[in-house]
Amino acid sequence: MAELKKNATIRFLEGIDETSIPEIRLTRSRDGRTGQAFFTFEEPQALSAVKDGSIQGMSMFDEEGELKTREVKARFVNGTPSALEATYVWKSESDFQRFMRFAKRYASSNGMGYSEK
């Protein structure tokens, strides 16, 4: 069952909110139905908290519930993990709207802004 959170949070490990604030980039298909959000976490605490490589995905929690992706990769510098990159995919307009509600709550919870390039 999804955990309901008053503040929007992101987790790579169960029970541990990620404190590293990601860079987030969005892309959408021409018709706007599908798209992706790309997250890059530089030096996330999840990398220091995990010893056995057991990051299984990224979960995003807010007052509506949980969004989850299993598409997570580690980026290495000189053989040492330095960043986590995650991709969240939506396949409908309603999925996109749900993600945007999470993103706005996450931004508000973490003092972030939104800009279009």
Swiss-Prot record:
Topology with respect to the bilayer: Peripheral membrane protein
Supply one GO BP term. Answer: photosynthesis
Keywords (A to Z) from UniProt: Membrane, Photosynthesis, Photosystem II, Thylakoid
**Subcellular location as annotated:** Cellular thylakoid membrane
Annotated signal sequence range: none
Entry's transmembrane regions: none
Q: Record's superkingdom?
A: Bacteria
Q: Which GO terms describe its cellular component?
A: photosystem II oxygen evolving complex; plasma membrane-derived thylakoid membrane
Q: Which HAMAP family match?
A: PSII_Psb28
Q: Which family does it belong to?
A: Belongs to the Psb28 family.
Tell me the subunit arrangement.
Answer: Part of the photosystem II complex.
Q: What is this protein called?
A: Photosystem II reaction center Psb28 protein
Q: Which organism is it from?
A: Prochlorococcus marinus (strain SARG / CCMP1375 / SS120)
Q: What gene codes for this chain? A: psb28
